[in-house]
């Protein structure tokens, strides 16, 4: 495996249960404080990479060989952030980000911390749903990953506009400071892996088309957070969307804003689907429950020779759109399904959206199911 495999989520790892900050600090007998923040502590960083690396090294089953298939993996970007910590010359990943990115760009309200934001009265209250009930708090440590490259940045609209403007300027800040080479920007945006037809993933950025224009961006979600940045290099504009509520369609909102500005149709238009049907063999082999170590799952069921995807949000028709390819039409876009098959033709997993889900095979329904399957 190489670094570029992790940069484009093709290391071959299934989604695994999240290793979180609060449980790790409890086991270590330490806590966050303004005097000694976790994001700068060497012992916490080393414990985090130890836990993640040991778990990844223990995996015996994979989505495919490195570089073969896209499957979003926060663990991979966590490992990347620790590589930066070890080899950048800085004591922590947080310090590197501050010195090399935030300060040169003038992003004075952005940081990777936890407690400082929870105590900040000018920080957003986070609205999240747990066990069917809404909660409102400033718990910026809630479900936070132990390695900060997996999604720890807290920012503002103004700061993120400075960040996305750097891409539009070819790697240069508003003040003229070079943050990244023009070649580096281009490498980040080049397509490396297919997410679904018409959508690819580069080095930390997703790429799609809006007519003849290119759209490049990325989203993020946590309890109480829905976010999206979106760039159109040809038009020289960018959209930043931040919301302090979970499960908001941030990507759809950002793209609608971009389309409106560029004079494109704003509303989502469902694609014209080919006239295909699932064969009896395909229906038999696809039916079953697919479960991710992150806790998400879906079930493919058959009714009257048609397939449906059942999730917590309801049941939707799984359209056949090609050889062993399926599509679910959602409110704001399509979710593509691509099964992973063995040499014998058996379905043992499926990429659904951005994740690859192992198919359950009569094993115990626990959080380690991804590591128990055989491919």
Task: Name each model-derived stretch.
Residues 219, 242-246, 295, 303:
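Histidine- and/or cysteine-centered catalytic micro-motif in compact active-site loops
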Residues 131, 234-235, 344:
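Residue-level recognition of short loop/turn positions
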Residues 217, 228-245, 348-351:
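Short, well-ordered beta-strand elements
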Residues 213, 255-375:
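Peripheral terminal and inter-domain segments
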Residues 140-143, 233-237, 266-267:
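Short acidic (Asp/Glu) and glycine-rich catalytic loops that position anionic groups and cofactors
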Residues 246-247, 355:
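A short acidic/small-residue loop/turn micro-motif
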Residues 1-223, 227:
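Short, surface-exposed loop or secondary-structure junction motifs
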Residues 248-252:
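A short acidic/glycine-rich loop-to-helix N-cap element
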């Amino acid at each position: 495996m190489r670094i570029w495999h992790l940069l484009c989520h093709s290391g071959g790892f299934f989604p695994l249960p999240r290793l979180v900050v609060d449980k790790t600090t409890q086991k270590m007998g330490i806590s966050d404080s303004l005097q000694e923040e976790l994001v700068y502590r060497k012992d916490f960083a080393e414990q985090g990479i130890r836990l993640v690396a040991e778990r990844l090294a223990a995996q015996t089953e994979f989505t495919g060989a490195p570089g073969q298939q896209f499957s979003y993996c926060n663990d991979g970007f966590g490992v990347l952030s620790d590589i930066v910590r070890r080899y950048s010359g800085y004591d922590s990943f947080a310090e590197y980000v501050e010195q090399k990115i935030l300060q040169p760009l003038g992003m004075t309200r952005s940081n990777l911390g936890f407690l400082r934001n929870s105590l900040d009265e000018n920080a957003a209250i986070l609205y999240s749903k747990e066990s069917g009930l809404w909660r409102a708090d400033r718990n910026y440590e809630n479900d936070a990953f132990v390695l900060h490259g997996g999604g720890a940045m807290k920012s503002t609209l103004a700061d993120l506009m400075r960040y996305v403007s750097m891409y539009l300027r070819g790697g240069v800040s508003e003040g003229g400071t070079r943050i990244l080479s023009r070649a580096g920007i281009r490498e980040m945006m080049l397509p490396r892996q297919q997410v679904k037809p018409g959508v690819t993933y580069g080095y930390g950025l997703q790429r799609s088309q809006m007519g003849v224009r290119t759209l490049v961006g990325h989203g993020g979600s946590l309890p109480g957070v829905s976010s999206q940045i979106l760039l159109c290099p040809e038009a020289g504009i960018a959209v930043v969307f931040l919301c302090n509520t979970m499960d908001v369609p941030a990507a759809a909102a950002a793209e609608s804003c971009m389309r409106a500005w560029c004079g494109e149709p704003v509303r989502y238009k469902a694609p014209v689907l080919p006239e295909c049907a699932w064969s009896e063999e395909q229906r038999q082999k696809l039916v079953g429950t697919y479960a991710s170590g992150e806790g998400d799952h879906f079930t493919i069921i058959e009714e009257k020779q048609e397939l449906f995807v059942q999730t917590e949000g309801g049941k939707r028709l799984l359209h056949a759109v090609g050889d062993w390819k399926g599509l679910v039409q959602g409110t704001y876009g399509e979710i593509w399904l691509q099964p992973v098959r063995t040499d014998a033709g058996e379905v043992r997993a499926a990429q659904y959206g951005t994740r690859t889900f192992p198919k359950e095979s009569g094993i115990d329904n626990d959080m380690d199911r991804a590591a128990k399957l055989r491919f």
